[in-house]
Each structure stands twice: as structure tokens, then as C-alpha cells.
Regions:
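Buried, small/hydrophobic-residue-enriched core segments of structured protein domains
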Residues: 2-31, 40-42, 78, 84-93, ...
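N-terminal, Lys/Arg-enriched amphipathic/low-complexity engagement segments
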Residues: 28-88, 97
């Protein structure tokens, strides 16, 4: 496993990997389209501020399984050698459409859409959900604070309470997109 999760094929659920294995075994290689959208907003919330796209793009461009990832998957004794060889060569080759970061979105609107070979689209689902929903939540909260504070600037102080350095940077960036001064 590499030190960063950006681009790691292991940033997914085991369920997703078992689905990929089944697709590989059955030679399922069709194109699939997946959308990420919010069904409904909580009461007293009427908009979202989209964030997380830059991290998604970075992940998709760097996506791969390194030797450590494959060694770990091999140790699970759940996957065939042929499937693991397939993962070694797997790269994201699909298309991504997304609302630009900082845009306002409403319930029922797609925040992003992926069109790719089914195995690629399935693999990135967990990362997309985790990243876009988290960063959009932070950006939206920051926008609500900005609206409540009027013209007074506010800071996010994410490094003090975040769960690690990477999370602090992720929160600070999303808060800035939502209106934090720093």
C-alpha cells in the first residue's frame, strides 16, 4: 500500500472489489454511467455548495494498484491471479462531468457523472461518494456561516480539530470554497 490514498485502488469497499472480480470473471466490459446526486436536503437547508472535484480529478488521473496493494489483495485469498493481473494494469479511462466547485446545487441535481468501462466506474464509486459528499458538506456549512456572519470574515481553524493533516487540508480547501477567509 502506498503512503497516500490519492490514486490508490484500495480506496474502495471490499464489496466493490468483489463486484469487479465478478465482472472480470464474466467478461463484463460494457460502458456504464453513474451519477452522484442528493435525494433530498435536510429541513431548513435549501442548497449545497459543490466541492471535492479537484481531489476527484487528482484521484482519477493517478488511479492504480501498486505492488503493495496487490500483495495485500493476494493475501486475502479471495481473488484469482488473473484478476489481480488485470488490476495491475487498470487505469481510469472514462469521462467525468461535474458541476464546478463553488456552484450552488439543489436536491435532485447530479453533482457529477462518470461514464466509463463498468469495472472502472464501479471501482471509483466509493472514493467519489466519500470525497464529494464530505467536501460539499463542509463547503455548504461554510457558506451558511458566511451568510450568517454578513460582511465579517471568518476562519475555519480546521487543523485544530481535523482527523489528521490530510483531512485538515481537505476541510480548509472546502471551507474556502464555501466562503471562509482562511
Amino acid at each position: 500500500m502506498n503512503g497516500s490514498l490519492t490514486g490508490s485502488g484500495l480506496f474502495t469497499d471490499l464489496y466493490e472489489l468483489t463486484m469487479l472480480s465478478a465482472y472480470h470473471a464474466e467478461a463484463v466490459d460494457d460502458l456504464a454511467t453513474f451519477e452522484l446526486w442528493v435525494r433530498e436536503l435536510p429541513q431548513d437547508r435549501n442548497f449545497l455548495v459543490v466541492a471535492g472535484l479537484q481531489e476527484v480529478v487528482d484521484h482519477l488521473l493517478a488511479l492504480q494498484f501498486d505492488d503493495g496493494d496487490l500483495s495485500y489483495l493476494r493475501s486475502l485469498e479471495m481473488f484469482t491471479p488473473e484478476f489481480l493481473d488485470h488490476l495491475r494494469d487498470l487505469r481510469f479511462t472514462g469521462d467525468l462531468w461535474a458541476m464546478p466547485e463553488g456552484n450552488i446545487a439543489f436536491a435532485g441535481e447530479p453533482l457529477l457523472r462518470v461514464r466509463a468501462r463498468r469495472i472502472e466506474a464501479q471501482l471509483v464509486e466509493t472514493f467519489l461518494l466519500a470525497t464529494v459528499t464530505f467536501e460539499t458538506m463542509i463547503a455548504t456549512k461554510a457558506a451558511r456561516v458566511a451568510l450568517a456572519s454578513g460582511a465579517r470574515p471568518f476562519a475555519d481553524f480546521s487543523a485544530r480539530r481535523a482527523h489528521g493533516a490530510a483531512a485538515a487540508v481537505q476541510v480548509a480547501r472546502a471551507a474556502f470554497i464555501g466562503g471562509a477567509a482562511s
